[in-house]
């Protein structure tokens, strides 16, 4: 299921250039979920192509894999204004698209707080749940979910960088 190119399910459509669709390869059953597209993602129509994407790509490479082995998507498909976190009603509008992207996954990696709130209902500190495997329910399926920091958090926080590197090592093991 893909959003209509003229989607107007929430107010985010007003500021978008492009709907940002998933990127990568779903055949391995591993999906990274980010919060929302940024400026460069909105311009290109692909997730994680800006500064955070370069960090993510570098960490995947360090762990021995790349985008051709995973799928990358976001909780919302249009850029929130001023790069703010997506609002609950915006995530709810995109939820059917996200569920269809996650349905066949074996492992979902949540990159940041917004997707943890959306997929797990968790609104506490990320530090309490990072890299603790959990289970989420997508329709009638239970899927392993690993919450971790958004790549942007690693710019200013060494602890989040180490945690995200550990996440990538776990994903590399799942790919074996």
Report the location of each language-model feature:
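Active-site and ligand/interface coordination hotspots across diverse enzymes
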Residues: 1-51, 61-62, 141, 176
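Short, flexible, glycine/charge-rich loop motifs used to bind or transfer phosphoryl groups or to couple energy/partner
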Residues: 19-23, 60-61, 98-100, 134-136
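Glycine/proline-rich loop-helix segments at beta-alpha junctions forming the active-site rim
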Residues: 67-68, 75-176
């Amino acid at each position: 299921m893909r959003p209509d190119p003229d989607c107007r399910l929430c107010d985010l459509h007003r500021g978008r250039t492009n709907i940002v669709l998933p990127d990568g390869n779903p055949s391995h059953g591993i999906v990274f979920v980010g919060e929302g597209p940024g400026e460069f993602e909105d311009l290109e129509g692909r997730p994680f192509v800006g500064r955070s994407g370069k960090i993510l790509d570098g960490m995947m490479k360090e762990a021995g894999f790349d985008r051709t082995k995973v799928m990358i998507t976001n909780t919302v498909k249009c850029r929130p204004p001023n790069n703010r976190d997506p609002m609950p009603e915006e995530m709810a509008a995109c939820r059917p698209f996200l569920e269809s992207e996650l349905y066949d996954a074996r492992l979902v990696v949540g990159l940041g707080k917004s997707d943890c709130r959306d997929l797990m209902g968790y609104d506490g500190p990320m530090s309490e749940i990072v890299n603790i495997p959990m289970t989420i329910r997508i329709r009638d399926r239970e899927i392993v979910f690993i919450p971790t920091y958004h790549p942007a958090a690693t710019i200013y926080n060494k602890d989040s960088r180490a945690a995200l590197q550990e996440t990538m090592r776990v994903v590399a093991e799942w790919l074996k």
